[in-house]
Amino acid sequence: MEYRKLGSSYYIRMDKGDEIVATIRDVCRREDIASATFSGIGGCQDAEIQVFRPELGEFETERIEGLLELVSLTGNLIQKDDGELSHHVHALFAYQCDGEPRIAAGHLKSTTVLYTAEIELRPVEGGVIGASLNLDTNTYFWGFRD
């Protein structure tokens, strides 16, 4: 992984074997970024994608493997009261299964880079977006701080 700050954004190039969410979180820790948004594209070798099932109160996870084109990645990182980062990431992958084109999309739990990923990380300027625990989903939503 290599990254540069240009203007107010960070541009991150990831390499084979990098886990995208963990790498973004690592850059935020290194650069003392408390809240940010990001987007990106790339090629991955596996992914765990989730969809929230409100009737069950839990996430359903699907794992896909192979040559996965990361068509779109978007998300944010926010800071919980204990200082830890909480992430919310969605992804869209295109791939082939038995020679047929497929897409998979949803909440991204994890994905590993196959050849590269290119991410733009945009720190929030002028404050911090905190995290508030939503009891219905047991996940963190934006919690604005005064």
Language-model segments: what does each one mean?
Residues 1-41, 45-87, 92-146:
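N-terminal intrinsically disordered, cationic/polar leader segments
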